[in-house]
């Protein structure tokens, strides 16, 4: 007996579209699960007031007048300390914090060349003149060349002698009072021997993620703790050259 023809329901045309939509949704959901999450770099802003026994957040200081100074160094040459310090200063400036970047690597210097502002007018460490051992931070800020809304005080050892320790101390204290954050690049941790005013500042040490780089970083960390300096924050880096 022949079966009577099935009468299509009025909304039968919707079913293929619904199935396609469900398949697209399932495929999109699968792609989202398979996709690795994007991890954005996090920059910790310093707290205006921190205790000596505070946590490991960037900006904790014991040096009076420089509570918002952060010192960057690396036990391995070419690890990108200057670039890392400049990027931290740049990110802080993006967060609407007034930031100064200071080049205290008096053996090599040249952070203004790295940033492409070597021809910009303004102060360099070799041209700072503080005869009375004290200066106004706001006036000093106004004399610094700017890079991405960051005032930069570079060192140019090829254009003069190293500044006197009291000049460095006066500059750092003035900048700390006139800025939210002062980022200091000293090159190597051993530079703290000639920069005693920075020994109790928050230290960030870059460790190159190689066998030799980690051994150097471990020795530098032990030396800093042994000499009574603040326990450093260690940051692992993998330099990528040409």
Predicted regions and their residues:
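Walker A/P-loop phosphate-binding motif and the immediately C-terminal alpha-helix
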Residues: 66-115, 175
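Hydrophobic/aromatic beta-strand patches that form the interior of the parallel beta-sheet core
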Residues: 70, 100-102, 151-153, 202-205, ...
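Conserved protein kinase catalytic core
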Residues: 109-111, 160, 191-193
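Cytosolic-facing regulatory segments adjacent to core modules
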Residues: 134-189
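Conserved catalytic-core segment of NTP-binding enzymes
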Residues: 170-242
């Amino acid at each position: 007996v022949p079966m009577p023809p099935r009468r299509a329901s009025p909304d039968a045309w919707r079913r293929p579209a619904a199935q396609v939509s469900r398949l697209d949704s399932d495929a999109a959901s699968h792609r989202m699960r398979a996709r690795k999450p994007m991890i954005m770099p996090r920059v910790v802003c310093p707290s205006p007031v921190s205790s000596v026994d505070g946590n490991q957040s960037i900006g904790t200081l014991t040096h009076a007048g420089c509570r918002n100074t952060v010192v960057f160094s690396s036990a391995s040459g070419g690890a990108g300390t200057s670039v890392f310090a400049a990027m931290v200063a740049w990110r802080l400036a993006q967060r609407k914090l007034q930031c100064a970047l200071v080049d205290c690597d008096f053996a090599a210097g040249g952070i203004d060349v790295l940033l492409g502002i070597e021809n910009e007018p303004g102060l360099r460490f070799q041209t700072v003149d503080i005869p009375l051992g004290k200066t106004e931070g706001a006036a000093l800020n106004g004399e610094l060349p700017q890079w991405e809304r960051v005032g930069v005080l570079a060192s140019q050892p090829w254009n003069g002698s190293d500044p006197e320790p009291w000049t460095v101390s006066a500059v750092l204290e003035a900048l700390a009072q006139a800025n939210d954050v002062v980022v200091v690049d000293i090159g190597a941790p051993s530079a703290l021997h000639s920069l005693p005013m920075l020994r109790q500042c928050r230290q960030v040490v870059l460790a190159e993620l190689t066998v030799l780089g980690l051994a150097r970083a471990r020795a530098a960390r032990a030396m800093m703790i042994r000499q009574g300096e603040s326990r450093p924050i260690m940051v692992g880096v993998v330099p990528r050259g040409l």
